[in-house]
Amino acid sequence: MSDETIFINRELSWLDFNRRVLALGKDKNVPLAEQVKFLAIYGSNLDEFFMVRVGSLQERANLEQSKSKKEKRENKTNMTAAEQLAAIMPKTAQLQADCDKYYAKALEELAGCGYRKVDFDHLSKEDERFWKKYFQTELFPILSPQIVDSRHPFPFLRNKEIYLGVLLREKHPNAQSLGIIPISSQMERLHFVKKDGETQFALVEELVLHYASSIFGKESILESCLFRVTRNADIDVKEGMMDHDIDYREIMTELLKRRRKLAAVRLQVTPEAAPEVQRLLCSRLELSGKRVFVQKSPLDLSFFYKLTGRIEAEDHPGLFYPAARPMLPPPDYDLTEEVQKHDVLLSYPYQSIRPFIDMLKKAARDPDVISIKMTLYRMARESQIVQALMEAAENGKEVVALVELRARFDEQNNIDWSKQLENAGCTVIYGFDDYKVHSKLTLITRKQADGYSYITQIGTGNYNEKTSELYTDYSFITADEGIGEEASKVFRNLAVQQLTEESDRMLVAPLRFKSVLLDEMDHVIAAARMGRPASMILKNNSISDRDIILKLQEASCAGVRIDMIVRGICCVRAEVPGKTENLHIRSLVGRYLEHGRIYSFFDGVHTRIYIASGDFLTRNTECRVEVGVRVEDPVLVKKLTDILQLQLRDNVNAREMCADGSYQKVKPAEGEPIVNGQMGMYDLLRNDWTREEPWKPTTPKAAPAEAPAAEKQTAAEGPKAKTPEVPVQEPPKAKGPDFVEAASATPAPIHLEPTEHPKGGDHFDELEQMLDKKHLPDQPQKPTVVVTAPKKRGLFSQVLGLFKKRK
C-alpha cells in the first residue's frame, strides 16, 4: 500500500515546525514580550537544526562524494543527503526573511511601549559622546583584534560567537587584509540607558561595529560587518568507544572538546558584508556560498531573554502572559499514601512536580525503603531530584542512577551530576553502547513483613524541575505490584546491558514498543472493517517511522477515524484523498511546549490508552530505550481522554495540516467559543488531587467478547470525578465530503473497564479472526528473548538486527 505521495521529508517538516514557532512572533493574540521570546526560540531552534541535522547531512554528503559510493536515499521521500541540503537552504532563507520582518515590527512596538533600541547610524551629538566614552572605557580595553595576512594565520572561529569583520587597505597597491575582532560571549551583550522617560538598549556588537575605526584606523577600513559561524555538533560517540578500559565519562569529555572544532555548516552576515568579505570567509571556512545567510535582524536573537527580563522587572504585566503557576495539592497531601489507594497521574506544568519530589525525599528517609532506581536524561542545574537520590544513598539505601551522558547539549551537566552521584555513594550506570536510554522510569522498593512493595513512576518528560514548569508532560505513578516487578526487571537488564521482550504491561523499546502499538492499530482496523465506529487519537512530538505511517494509511483506508496531535516533525500528509482522508493532523504550539505522548485506541466498544516516553520517530521506536505503560484506572483513562478532547477542540494554539502538507491556523467559527487547549487544563484539573473511592485492578479473568449491558454501564461510570468546567466531550466535526461516516465517532463514547488485562489485549475475540498476526498482545507470550550488549563495537547492532521485525 506504499505511496510516496503521503510522505514528507523529515528535515523540511522540521522547518515547517519552526515556521509555526516563528509565526507566534507576530501573533496579535500573543503579548508583545512573549512574541519576541518566540523570535528568540525560533533562532535557537534553527541554530540547533544546523548544528545537528545539517551537520549530519553534510558529513554524509561529503562521504558519499569522496568515496564515489552509491548515494543513500532517505526511506520516505527518496532524497539523497545532497538533495535534502539543496532543499533546506532556500526554505531557510525564506524563513529568515520573515524573521527579519517580524523583528522590525517588534522593535517598533517595543519603542511604543518605552523600550527603544539604539540606532548607531542616527545618533545625536550628545548620544555620540556618551557611547564613544562608554566604548573607550568599558569595551576597548578588553577587545582582541586580529589581522589575517601572510604573517598571521586565520584564527579559529568559535561556534555561535559573533565577530566583527573588517576589510583593510594595505600599503601595497591593491593589497587587502582581513581584520577580525571576537565579540566574546563573556561580554555583557545588552547595555541599558534611561533617557527621556524611556529605556534605551544597545547591542554590544553594534557598538563595536560603530567604533571599529578607533581600533583599525578610519583610513584603513574598506568594509566592515558582523558575522557568526555555526559548526557541526553531531559527534559520533562510537568513535570513542573502541577502548573499553577508558572511563566513559572521560570519553564523553574528550568528545565534547572535539565537537567545538568540527566543520562550519552556516555563515550568518549582516547586510553591510561586502561580497569580498563573504568570499574570504567562505574560503577559509570551506563553505559554499549557498550556506551564507544575510540577515537584517541581529545574528543572535537570544538577547531578547534579557530584555524581557528587564521589562518584567520594571512591572509591565500587560506585555506578558497572565501569571499561571503549577497547582499545588492540599497541605496534607501525601503522594506516597495516595498511590496506595489508586494510581495517580500528574500533568505538568498545570500541576506541580512538588509531590513527586516530596515522595522521593520521604523515600530517602524511610527506614523501610531499601532501594531507589531512576533513569536520568536531562536534569536541572540545581536539581532537588538528584539531591534526594544522594540523600538516600547517604542514608544507606541502594540507589541506582542510570545517567545518559549522550543527552545532546546536556552532556557536560550530566557528566557533572554523575560524579556527584557517585561521590554520594550511588551506583551510576550509563546504559548501552548503541542505544540512548531516553526512558523516564523510577522504582522505589520497600521492605514489608510479607515481602516487597513497589512504587513505580513512568513519565513522558524529564526529571527536571525547571522544564516541568514549561513543558506539558504526564507522570504516571502506581503501587501496582505487577508493574513494579516489570520495572525491576527493566533496571536489572539495563544494569547488565541486556534488552528483553519479557514484559506484559510495560512497553519497552526497542523490542516491545512499536510492535505493541502496531498490534493495537491492527485491532482498531479490524473493528472498523466489521462496521464498528473505530478510532484513534495519537498525541506526540514527532512522527517519521515508515512502518507506523503505512499502518496509519491502512487504517485510514479501512475507515478508522484518526486524530493526531503532532507538535513538530510530521512525515505523513493528512487528508490525501483515497490514502489518508480519515487522518486528521493538528499541531499545537503555544505558551507551553507540548511534550507529552498519549496513544488512545478505540475499537468501537472499549478504549485502551497508553502514555510513553517515546515518539513515533524511528530513533525512538528502533534506536532508543523507551518506556511506556497502558493506563487502566478508569478515572485516569477518562482524564487522559478529556485532555485529548480538549486539545482537539483548541482554536487558539492549533494549526491543522492540509493535504499538501501546509498548515492553516484554526480559528473559532462565528458563535463558537474560544478554546485554549493549554489554559483550559487548569479548569480540567482543578480539585484533581484526591478522590473518595480507591481503585485497584481485579484479578484478570477470561472475559466474554461482550460484557452484559448492566455490567458495562457500571464499569463505564467508574468512580465519580469532577466534571471539568471546559466542555471537552464534543466530537470534532467531519471534514469535507471525503469524510468516512464509519469513523465519525471520534471522540467516541468511552467504556471504562476496571478489569486488569496484563497481556495487553482484551475483548477482541471477534477481531482476532480477521487479523493475520502470529502474535497478539492477548495471546500467550512468546519465549523471552534476551539480547546481550556487545563486548566489541558493532556486534550489538548485528545481534539486535536478528530480532527486529520491521524495517
Question: Each PLM stretch: what is its role?
Answer:
Residues 546:
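Active-site glycine- and acidic-residue-rich loops that bind
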Residues 561-565:
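Hydrophobic alpha/beta core scaffold segments
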